[in-house]
Amino acid sequence: QSGQLCLSLMDSPGIRFSYSISAGNCAVTEMEDYISFLVDDEDTKVVAVYLEGVRNPRKLSDAFRRAALKRKPIVVLKAGRSEKGGKLAASHTGSLAGADKIFDALFDKFGVIRVNDLEELLYTAQMFAVLPKLPTLPTFASMNLSGGETGICADVGELCGLSYPDFEEETLEKLRELLPGYASPANPLDMT
């Protein structure tokens, strides 16, 4: 819903888009129509959206439901978290922008990933685009280059609801063969 942000995203090196759509104020078609189209498009692996508001919440919910059934990730940068931001977004698009907690509930219900800035929107969408298949559980393995990174990774993961399961014995044996003797083969993994 922003021409300038659309141009900024298109200028991102190393990221390929099947479509880059600027809906503007949605005078002819609604943002929900574009999201619905991208959910059904076979060439689109991930739907990344800058969203100010919607006019038809039911249509948006239906698109999110279909994406969840297809296991197609939707990543949203939603404007209007603050009172002032909500008013600005509503005046820009003339759509339902407020009630941010309602959007959060809708995102949670259908597994839509909400991000906080453009960089996070791009990197999250890119991560899902290159994954061979989506994870079925909120578990994660991480490999880091320092003890500091490893500690931060463990903390941030827990804050985000991720768990780092212990490696299977077969994996531990392989890591012991590959890592220097002073390295501890645990998850998250410190490579130093």
Task: Indicate residue ranges for each PLM-predicted region.
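Catalytic-core regions of core metabolic enzymes
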Residues: 1-192
